Amino acid sequence: MSDFHNIRSRRRIPEASSYSTVDFDYDPDQKNHTSAVAPTSFAYSSLTTVFNASASQLWNSAQEALVSSYDTAEGTESIDADRSKVVETLESLSIFGNPLDHIIITMPSRDRTSEFRATAKSYEMKAAANGIRPQPKHEMLSESVQFNQLAKRIGKELSQTCAKMEKLAEYAKKKSCYEERSQIDHLSSIVKSDITGLNKQIGQLQEFSKRRAGNMKNQNSGHIQLVVVGLQSKLANVGKDYQSVLEISTETMKAEKNRRDKFSSGAAVPMGLPSSSSGANVRSKLLQDDEQHGSSSIALDMGALSNMQSQQTMQQRDSSLEYAQARSNTMATIEGSISELGQIFSQLASLVSEQGEMITRIDSNVEDTALNIDMAHSELVRYLQNISKNRWLMIQVFGVLMVFFVVFVLFLT
């Protein structure tokens, strides 16, 4: 082991060459040694050389051992050529890369598909024995597609209802909504029917989600619950906006009625006799009538005046009745909307309470997880302390062995 062939030393030397080589005798039996070495000293020196050798030196020694074994197997005629080829190959492997990278390892393969199928079959039989009936995949996909389509349709109808609500709010915020009263009533009835239909559809979606959640307990059920809660909250916001729009419309109608009452009370004076401002015109008309009839007396047709006054009174009464009827219809619509909003908010409250229970369970689980993490941290700290103590013990044992080895080598050689 002390005679290595062409050992490449990485020690810097003052000469021009970067590496120093040691010649190796390929036939050590025929070499004449000038000095005899004791067997014990030779063994100790060999052991010291092995411990002091680097990884490259050990690799080169393994190369030489491989070359020597190859030489004994081949004939004497091609020994030099084969030796040079092997040495060049091994040197190229040792210099240009890891030799293991150039080795192609082929592992035996075996088809275990039948074993996998048998395992799956046994699992299905075990589940059937326990009373667990797995839901077919196509049924799960169809239910998921149905839920997504229903939720998508509800969301689209909600957006359309919001657009109608904005238009209704524009009509209701106008100061004089007498001309748009028919449009406001029409849009109010449409929005009310839309809110009622959306509430029913969301109820169906909630029942569908509860039915699906009973069959599975995973993240998909939680996602379904969140979708239902989101749609219900959007519908509640739409209902709240509808209620505010109806209140604005009612206030506008009340202001319009007050304004009409003010003007009607101001116009009640000319119903009987003409006012002083128009006295000259009336007097001129009477004079013209006198001149036409050729009479010096003044005659007033009291029957015509009473008929005109009764007609005006009937018209005002009819308009008042129409306004009262419209207002009663509006109030009935508002009351119905408020009752429907109460139902919607009650459903939303139930959903929020369910989510609150889920959040409470999540909070408790988080607390348990934090407690487990603290316990795991304490265990890891304890394990680290044990490892550090064992490491120090290993260092002490290794130091004692090294001291014993050095003393043994120095004093016994």
Curated annotation (Swiss-Prot):
Domain of life, source organism: Eukaryota
Annotated spans, Disordered: 257-290
Localization (cell): Membrane
InterPro entries: SNARE (IPR010989), Syntaxin (IPR045242), Syntaxin-5_N (IPR021538), Syntaxin/epimorphin_CS (IPR006012), T_SNARE_dom (IPR000727)
Domain (t-SNARE coiled-coil homology): residue spans on this chain: 321-383
Residue spans crossing the bilayer: 392-412
Chief place where the protein resides: membrane
Residues on Extracellular side: 413
Keywords: Coiled coil, Membrane, Neurotransmitter transport, Transmembrane, Transmembrane helix, Transport
GO terms under cellular component: endomembrane system; Golgi membrane; presynapse; SNARE complex
Cytoplasmic topological intervals: 1-391
PROSITE patterns, per database record: SYNTAXIN, T_SNARE
Molecular function terms from GO: SNAP receptor activity; SNARE binding
Membrane topology of this protein: Single-pass type IV membrane protein
One GO-annotated biological process of the protein: vesicle fusion
Pfam families: SNARE, Syntaxin-5_N
Protein family: Belongs to the syntaxin family.
Record's protein name: Putative syntaxin-5
Organism field: Caenorhabditis elegans
